[in-house]
Regions:
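Active-site pocket-lining/capping segments in soluble small-molecule metabolic enzymes
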Residues: 1-112, 116-238
Length: 238
């Protein structure tokens, strides 16, 4: 099914799950502490930047989620399969998707991911239309893509000197951005969102199996920006 990645913990009816899409949460100590009775209703996304001093913590979180019934995981760096045991990876009821931060752009990469135990993959959101439309035909795994939402332009382990978190700041070209802290990393977002929804039918015809919406709690002070959100759709992959 399609995925909706939430930026914060769901409340009330949001914990019941939905038939049309899979609600997903980022793996953290806070998210893993939700009621054990609803953990299996969510997909669980591992952050792309897990540092050596955090590995043991995330390994414990993954094990805890697994014991409570979680079976749908999205890994945003290929090495993260090492956080799972062989028994987990061999479980036929489990799904291990290579996430969009794995920067998947060609079928050779997907072949390697399949050999590593991944069951599906989400391609890089920064491809051009030609590459987007060509990949599913050549892929050995079911493919998904980020269709809409907040996609970061970068992330850093270091602080944002001179920039306040959760408030807009301007680039030298007078483009608005904002930053938010997640764990040890600072994520930097543009004021405009990715939006390829107008091309959904074309992408479905090309062979994409599912689509992803990435939600964020956008700062109220962020100025409105009129941009189509196509990112590199009209460009070629360099």
């Amino acid at each position: 099914p399609d995925m909706v990645v939430h930026a914060s913990l769901p409340q009330g009816k949001e914990t019941r799950g939905a038939r049309k899409f899979l609600s997903c949460l980022w793996v953290s100590s806070k998210s893993a502490a939700i009621s054990h009775t609803v953990i299996n209703r969510f997909g669980w996304w591992l952050p792309p930047g897990i540092w050596p001093d955090e590995e043991d913590q995330f390994r414990r979180l993954v094990l805890s989620l697994w014991r409570d019934g979680a079976r749908s995981f999205v890994l945003n760096s290929p090495w993260q399969v090492g956080l799972f045991t062989t028994e987990m990876l061999d479980d036929e009821k489990a799904s291990f998707t290579a996430g969009p931060f794995c920067n998947i752009s060609n079928p050779a990469t997907v072949n390697v991911l399949k050999d590593m135990g991944f069951t599906a993959a989400i391609v890089s959101p920064e491809l051009g239309s030609r590459d987007f439309l060509e990949l599913p035909r050549l892929s050995p795994l079911p493919l998904g893509m980020v269709l809409a939402g907040c996609w970061p332009v970068g992330m850093s382990r270091y602080g944002t000197l001179g920039v306040r978190l959760n408030e807009p700041f301007m680039s030298p070209k007078h483009e608005a951005f904002w930053a938010r802290q997640y764990g040890e990393n600072t994520w930097i977002y543009p004021a405009w969102q990715l939006n390829l929804s107008a091309h959904k039918a074309e992408l479905e015809k090309a062979g994409y199996s599912f689509f992803v919406s990435m939600q964020e709690n956008i700062p109220a002070s962020l100025p409105p920006v009129r941009r189509p959100g196509l990112f590199n759709w009209d460009n070629s992959l360099m």
